[in-house]
Amino acid sequence: MASNFKKTTMASSAQRKRMSPKPELTEDQKQEIREAFDLFDADGTGTIDIKELKVAMRALGFEPKKEEIKKMISEIDKEGTGKMNFSDFLTVMTQKMSEKDTKEEILKAFKLFDDDETGKISFKNLKRVAKELGENLTDEELQEMIDEADRDGDGEVNEQEFLRIMKKTSLY
């Protein structure tokens, strides 16, 4: 029952996201990605060295972890050429940019819950949102939701805990 609430609180924005299955970038974003790619395609061959993926991503404001880079490389460089073309790079960066947007959306939702600006969602915050949404949940059900998301045991849900639980419920 408690998980139904989580699903309904974010359902409308989750449904909007599902309607466009492939993330779209603005022309400016595509141009920015092209410029970063061209910077590393110094010899003009239309490919960049796969080892430069991390540096190229950093140039676009991302801080990829080593494991994340390894996974991307294994998906892109299936033939083991050590090279990546612009199309592959654009695909990777489109995915990364849409993930960034998702995180921003989740944090906006967090701020709606955290109306007293404590940096945490309290039982009181959750109860208010449930009431505003017309959800008839018992105090026990609301407390179960807090308990499920609360990792540090302080009885409230901070931004990281909220991000984790929202990603876990696959609404984003």
Swiss-Prot record:
The keyword DNA repair applies. Residues 1-31 are annotated as: Disordered. One of its GO terms (biological process) is protein transport. Residues 28-63, 64-99, 101-136, 137-172 form the EF-hand domain. Residues 2-25 are annotated as: Required for self-assembly. Gene3D superfamilies: EF-hand. The keyword Cell division applies. Plays a fundamental role in microtubule organizing center structure and function. Required for centriole duplication and correct spindle formation. Has a role in regulating cytokinesis and genome stability via cooperation with CALM1 and CCP110. Involved in global genome nucleotide excision repair (GG-NER) by acting as component of the XPC complex. Cooperatively with Rad23b appears to stabilize Xpc. In vitro, stimulates DNA binding of the Xpc:Rad23b dimer. Pfam families: EF-hand_7 (PF13499). The modification Phosphothreonine is found at residue 26. Ubiquitously expressed in all adult tissues tested, with strongest expression in brain, spleen, kidney, small intestine and ovary. Also expressed in the NIH 3T3 fibroblast cell line and peripheral blood lymphocytes. PANTHER family: CALCIUM BINDING PROTEIN. It comes from Mus musculus. CDD domains: EFh. The modification Phosphoserine is found at residue 20. The modification N-acetylalanine is found at residue 2. Keywords: Acetylation, Calcium, Cell cycle, Cell division, Cytoplasm, Cytoskeleton, DNA damage, DNA repair, Isopeptide bond, Metal-binding, Mitosis, mRNA transport, Nuclear pore complex, Nucleus, Phosphoprotein, Protein transport, Repeat, Translocation, Transport, Ubl conjugation. This is Centrin-2.
